[in-house]
Every structure is written in structure tokens, then in C-alpha cells.
Swiss-Prot record:
Gene: ligA
InterPro entries recorded: BRCT_dom, BRCT_dom_sf, DisA/LigA_HHH, DNA_ligase, DNA_ligase_AS, DNA_ligase_CS, DNAligase_adenylation, DNAligase_N
Organism of origin: Paracidovorax citrulli (strain AAC00-1)
Name this protein carries in UniProt: DNA ligase
Listed EC numbers: 6.5.1.2
Cofactor: Mg(2+); Mn(2+)
Similarity-based family: Belongs to the NAD-dependent DNA ligase family. LigA subfamily.
GO cellular component term of the entry, any: cytosol
Organism domain of life: Bacteria
Function (record text): DNA ligase that catalyzes the formation of phosphodiester linkages between 5'-phosphoryl and 3'-hydroxyl groups in double-stranded DNA using NAD as a coenzyme and as the energy source for the reaction. It is essential for DNA replication and repair of damaged DNA.
Length: 732
């Protein structure tokens, strides 16, 4: 759509009909961009451009309220507060789908065999065609359109009667307020779209972060956060929660005989839903027979943790609508569909004890010892409690029934305690995801200390206390001001830290000691062959080859890798020391600024603060590390063992050619990698940022540059290609 010449800057005196045309043009443009962004997942303009047009429409409607239409993008966030949610009786019941109890892929074969049996198909009959789709972990929703306009949105409720949540659903940008006319089927007078309201994982994480910053309760999981938002009485609150929607079916619809669409298959219906502007999951596909259903179950299961949203299984539906009618229903469940779940990712179990683990940096982590429970596809017996403040916040004590979450490779964690009201059924439902669902608050937040305090407990179960001495080495445990975590002060003398410190020192991004893996480090530390980092370079062939499963050839390879690692760089060495808050980028900045290790070791906090991107917390951590005599001794011993690197003069930042300039890199450069370009710019005194702002001096853009380039053009920031950047570096 071409931009209307008067879209943003209207003449001082504009005719009423021109005002209406301008408002219509703005609405049409916003609808088109929203469709591209939310439905097609193919945005064509940066967010800032959308916001600019939105604000222009908003200003126009504010000045001329008579131009506001029900489908205007400005009307999504109404901000009205409802006195209560009104019951809604579904014209077509929102029935549940039978769940296949076999969570293995073979469950698909069971369903296919049942369908073939119900259809009385011969063994040699062609395979049945199905539609396979993800089973979204959200809140079922029914959207009613009359003459193409959204008039009502209702929750599933008990299947017969739900609740009117139209005021909140209108805030979801993926849901069209009006349907486009035209197309193969047109728009029927009555159309009910069934689907799922959900929250993307990234949006959920950002929401919880905002809750924490505001001192509010965090949410248990994306599903409960979405459900809590949908049932808010105040749509302004719902609008602040980033909800999304997928369509997957129809409810009440004008019959074909009265002008409604006459779909032959479920897949045809999904295609039309997309044509009407509804998002349909990209994973949806047709599948012929049991073998393709099994393949779909396995494929989606393997990528489940990489999806941007939660699913708890897949759904199979017979594709032919005629066969669906032939199969019919049994006990209010369709015979033509089944939900094939994956192992649950949240379950309930009992805390049998709380232990404390010590990590590489000395952080003490309380870990709940649990009654074994099968969750996320594995048997879980331990789950992290993070720190003392999380324990107090959640009110966890030994003997409590708790909700445990595990997703993919994420470490299992205790989400919260089971509220007192559910304790009578907790024993019966231990190991159940149903209880985990019920245990969250009505607004989707996690149960915490208040719920735990309400639970009847033995008065003899004390609150957990963090130990004052390290459980591994006996050193004093401290908690720095403003920090939630307790730490052991034993440093490299603590065996728990020693193992992790050795592995960190040896990793590819640090000293790159090939062959020095976890099992070998375990033997070296537990056998007391190594106590400090310099002991690595004192290892001999006899000591190494005498270890379990360490042949002489393998020992020689490790010794050769150790010898090779002696010739390193200052940034790698600094990173390998494992100083808190010092990652690869900070190590490079330190080396570039000071030139040599001695200058870094002797630097004051004030001098460290002069380094690019080093703030008070990082500066204090570096200064504290090198203030410890045993850490300085380790460094000197490593030097004495032959570890060496090339040092240079300290950088005078103010005299560097690009000092004070901020660059942003985007796209693929012809000859330089992103890291190479960054290194060259930083060596010339520039700061390389991750996002474009008014403080950005240059954007360096390569092929397939994204939104950063658009942002630069919008703000008027100069854009360079690789050649331009190199010329700038050479002072041309």
C-alpha cells in the first residue's frame, strides 16, 4: 500500500471527507502491517515505523472522536474495568479431546488402529489421512464474529458455559477485530473461531523480570500467566501482558445452505482461517497413516524445547470432515481426534531434605532432596532452590509438598509449595501435573510463603538456614551487600571450586587444554594429584599414565596440550582465572586498556573504572581477586611454570582515533567476521554496542542487515559498509 500523501501532515484546513479518508488509510496500513507481523511472521517495517503510524492515527482520532471505528487498532486496549465476568453459553459446546495415555510415539499407532476399527476398514485399505498439530499449553478460547466483526470472546469453562472476556481478548494484536471480505469462501454471517491464547517464553521471561523489578509476584509458567491475564476484570492489566493466539478450529458457523463455507477437510478449514487473518501454527501438516503420525510426534518432541512457546503434546484429527461426522462422538469426546501428550514438565512431590552445593565461583546453592518423581521425561530426585531468599519467598521447608519443574536440559527447580487448600489431595495426586496446575494462584502467580504458612506443619520442622562454614572446605561463608547468594571464601583452596576452576581454566575459550575434561579433573583432584592451577604444569608422564583409563599415549597427548597452552594471550589468561564478572569481552577490554598483567593486578578500583564497560561491581570483583595473596601466588607460579603471552603498552584511550565513538554492527560483512570487526574497532578506541540509539555515531551494515539498519536510517545515524569502516580505521 502506497503511503497517502497526507497521511502524517494534513493541511491546516482539511475537509471532513478527507479526514475520514486519512483515518481509513492509516487503519488499513496498520492492519496490513499487523497481519504481516503477527500472522505471516514476516514484518516489513521496523517497530518504530508501526508506532509512528499508530500515533498519527491516535492523534487524529483524539482530535476527531467521530472517526473512531470499532475495528481501529487504537481500540484494542480499552482500559475498562468490569464488575465481574458474565457467563456465556456456547452454542456449540467446547468439548475436550481424549488424551492418549501412552506418551511414547506408539500412542499414535494405537489411535490410528482405533480409527480404522471404528471405520471398519480392511487391513489392506489405504491409510487414513490426518491433520497433525501441536497441542498448545494455553487457554482455550472461542471468538464469535457476526458479519465479520468480533462481538464476543469466551473461555471454555465447563464446555457448556464459559466466561465473557471480550474486553481482554481485544488487546491481543494477533486477533483480528474485523475479517477481510472476499476470497474463496467470503465471510459467513456467523463465525466462531476456536483456538488457544498463550504466552511466548521470551515474553513470559520479560514479564516475570518486570514483576520482580516492581516487587510483585512472579508467575508459575506461561500458561498460568496467560490464563490469569485473560480473566482480569481490567483490560488495561491484560494489555500489559504480552498474549498471543493460535487458531485451530471452528464452533458455531452459518451452514453452507445459508451461505456459509462448505469445507471438505479440516486442513482446508485451517487454510481459510489463515486467509481470514488468524495465526495458524507453522508445524501443522497432513499425515497419512500411523507411521507419519509417529514421525510427527518424534519430530515435534525433539524440537519441543526450541519452540518459542510451550506445548504439552500433539493433536491428531481425521482430516476428512465427512469421516469425522461418520465417526461421531463418545461420552462427549470426538472419536476422530486425540491428544497425544509428552511427559509432563511440572509435577508435585515431597521435600525430604535440603542440601547445599558449592560451585566454581564459590556460590552456595541450596538443593531440595525430593521423593523421586518422573517429570520432563526423567526421574528427578533433586531440584535447585537457587538461594536463601528464594527459599524464604516460596516458604519451602523439609516435608512440604512442592511443585517441581523440568523442561529440556534445564536444571529441575522448585517452583513453589502446594497451598494448604490442596493438601488433603496432595498425597493422592503426588506425581501429578494436575495438582501442579491447581496449585498456582488465580492470577497465575506462583504460590509463595503465605500459602506455605497456611499449611499445617509439624512445629518441629525448622526454617532452613544457610551454613556459616563451607560444607566442602570449612572456610567462612559470606554474602556481599546487595547480593542474594552466599559464597565460600576458600577460593582455589576449596576442592569444590578447584574442580570447576580447573575445567574453566582448561576450556577452549580460555587456555584451550585439549583432553583435560571432567573425568580426568575428577581423578586429579580426588587423588590429590592437583591442588592448584600451577600443579597442572608440573604433571609428569608417570603420574598421568597411572590414572584409571589413562594409557601412556593419552597421557602424552594431555602433556603436549599443556605445553602448547603455555603460549597464550593475556585476555585468555585473564578469562581463565575465573574472576567473578570477568567474561571474554571484559578480559579483552582489561588487556587492551592496561597492556600488561602487572598493571591490572596493581590497579585501584578507580583505575579499573576507566576501562570500557567496567562498572563498580566488576571493578570491585577484580580488585578483590588480586588483593588476595593466594591468588597473586597462583599467578606468579603459573608464570614460573612457563605460561607466557605477549604484552603491549597501555592504551591511551583519549588519543586513539575512534575514542568516544559508538558503533553498531549488523548483517554479514564481505571479508571480516563480526568478532574481527569488533576487535578492530575496539582497538581503535571505539565502543561497539548491541543496539542503535541517538547516541550511536556509526552503523556498519553488511548483507542481510536487519532492523538495526532501519533504526539507523530512521534516526539519521550514518551507515558505513565494510570498506567505509576500514577507511575510517585507517584515518581516511
Amino acid at each position: 500500500m502506497a503511503e497517502h500523501p497526507d497521511l502524517f501532515s494534513a493541511p491546516a484546513q482539511e475537509a471532513p471527507e478527507d479526514l475520514g479518508l486519512r483515518a481509513a488509510a492509516l487503519r488499513a496500513q496498520l492492519h496490513q502491517w499487523a497481519h504481516q507481523y503477527y500472522v505471516l511472521d514476516a514484518p516489513t517495517v521496523p517497530d518504530a515505523e508501526y508506532d509512528r503510524v499508530f500515533q498519527a492515527l491516535q492523534a487524529l482520532e483524539t482530535a476527531h472522536p467521530e472517526l473512531v471505528t470499532p475495528d481501529s487498532p487504537t481500540q484494542r486496549v480499552i482500559g475498562a474495568v468490569m464488575e465481574g465476568l458474565t457467563p456465556v453459553r456456547h452454542t456449540v459446546p467446547m468439548l475436550s479431546i481424549r488424551t492418549e495415555t501412552d506418551t511414547e510415539a506408539s500412542g499414535a499407532e494405537t489411535f490410528d488402529a482405533r480409527v480404522r476399527r471404528e471405520l471398519k476398514l480392511a487391513p489392506d485399505a489405504p491409510p487414513v489421512e490426518y491433520v497433525a498439530e501441536p497441542k498448545f499449553d494455553g487457554l482455550a478460547m472461542s471468538l464469535r464474529y457476526e458479519n465479520g466483526r468480533l462481538v464476543q470472546a469466551a473461555t471454555r469453562g465447563d464446555g457448556e458455559v464459559g466466561e465473557d472476556v471480550t474486553h481482554n481478548i481485544r488487546t491481543i494484536r494477533q486477533i483480528p477485530l474485523t475479517l477481510p471480505t472476499g476470497g474463496r469462501y467470503g465471510v459467513p454471517p456467523v463465525l466462531e473461531v476456536r483456538g488457544e491464547v498463550y504466552m511466548r517464553r521470551a515474553d513470559f521471561d520479560r514479564l516475570n523480570e518486570r514483576q520482580r523489578e516492581a516487587g510483585g509476584k512472579t508467575f508459575v509458567n506461561p500458561r498460568n500467566a496467560a490464563a490469569g491475564a485473560v480473566r482480569q476484570l481490567d483490560s488495561g492489566i491484560a494489555a500489559q501482558r504480552p498474549l498471543s493466539f493460535f487458531a485451530y478450529g471452528l464452533g458455531d458457523i452459518t451452514p453452507a445452505a445459508e451461505g456459509g463455507p462448505d469445507f471438505a477437510t479440516h486442513f482446508d478449514m485451517l487454510r481459510q482461517l489463515k486467509a481470514w487473518g488468524f495465526p495458524v501454527a507453522a508445524q501443522v501438516r497432513t499425515a497419512r497413516g500411523a507411521s507419519e503420525l509417529v514421525a510427527f510426534h518424534q519430530e515435534v518432541g525433539a524440537s519441543r524445547d526450541q519452540l518459542p512457546y510451550d506445548i504439552d503434546g500433539v493433536v491428531y484429527k481425521v482430516n476428512s470432515l465427512a469421516l469425522q461426522r461418520q465417526l461421531g462422538f463418545v461420552t462427549r469426546e470426538p472419536r476422530w481426534a486425540v491428544a497425544h501428550k509428552y511427559p509432563a514438565q511440572e509435577m508435585v512431590t515431597r521435600v525430604e531434605g535440603i542440601d547445599v552445593q558449592v560451585g566454581r565461583t564459590g556460590k552456595l546453592t541450596p538443593v531440595a532432596r525430593l521423593a523421586p518423581v518422573f517429570v520432563g521425561g526423567v526421574t528427578v530426585t533433586n531440584a535447585t532452590l537457587h538461594n536463601l531468599f528464594e527459599i524464604r519467598k516460596k516458604g519451602v521447608r523439609v516435608g512440604d509438598q512442592v511443585i517441581v519443574r523440568r523442561a529440556g536440559d534445564v536444571i529441575p527447580e522448585v517452583v513453589g509449595t502446594v497451598p494448604a487448600a490442596l493438601l488433603p489431595v496432595a498425597g493422592a495426586l503426588q506425581g501429578s501435573d494436575a495438582l501442579a496446575d491447581a496449585a498456582s494462584g488465580a492470577d497465575g502467580t506462583a504460590p509463595g510463603a503465605d500459602a506455605a504458612r497456611a499449611a499445617p506443619r509439624s512445629p518441629y520442622v525448622p526454617n532452613f538456614r544457610m551454613p556459616r562454614q563451607c560444607p566442602i572446605c570449612g572456610s567462612t561463608v559470606v554474602r556481599e551487600k546487595g547480593e542474594a547468594n552466599h559464597r565460600c571464601t576458600g577460593g582455589l583452596f576449596c576442592p569444590a571450586q578447584r574442580k570447576e576452576a580447573l575445567l574453566h581454566f582448561a576450556q577452549r575459550r580460555a587456555m584451550d587444554i585439549e583432553g583435560l575434561g571432567e573425568k580426568l579433573v575428577d581423578q586429579l583432584v580426588e587423588g590429590q594429584v592437583i591442588r592448584t592451577l600451577p600443579d597442572l604444569y608440573r604433571l609428569g608422564l608417570t603420574a598421568l599414565s597411572s590414572l584409571d583409563r589413562m594409557a601412556e599415549k593419552s597421557a602424552q597427548n594431555v602433556l603436549a596440550a599443556l605445553e602448547k597452552s603455555k603460549h597464550t594471550t593475556l585476555p585468555r589468561f585473564l578469562f581463565g582465572l575465573g574472576i567473578r564478572h570477568v567474561g571474554e569481552a571484559t578480559a579483552k577490554d582489561l588487556a587492551r586498556h592496561f597492556g600488561g598483567l602487572d598493571a591490572i593486578m596493581d590497579a585501584s578500583v578507580e583505575q579499573l573504572l576507566e576501562v570500557n564497560d567496567v562498572g563498580p561491581v566488576v571493578a570491585e570483583a577484580i580488585h578483590t581477586f588480586f588483593a588476595q595473596p593466594h591468588n597473586r601466588e597462583v599467578v606468579e607460579q603459573l608464570r614460573a611454570c612457563g605460561v607466557t603471552w605477549k604484552e603491549g603498552p597501555p592504551a591511551e584511550r583519549a588519543t586513539l582515533p575512534l575514542a568516544g565513538k559508538t558503533f553498531v554492527l549488523t548483517g554479514t560483512l564481505p571479508t571480516l567476521s563480526r568478532e574481527d570487526a569488533k576487535d578492530r574497532l575496539e582497538a581503535a578506541g571505539a565502543k561497539v554496542a548491541g543496539s542503535v540509539s541517538r547516541k550511536t555515531h556509526y552503523v556498519v551494515a553488511g548483507e542481510e542487515a536487519g532492523s538495526k539498519l532501519a533504526k539507523a536510517q530512521e534516526l539519521g545515524v550514518p551507515v558505513l559498509d565494510e570498506a567505509g569502516m576500514l577507511a575510517l580505521l585507517q584515518g581516511r
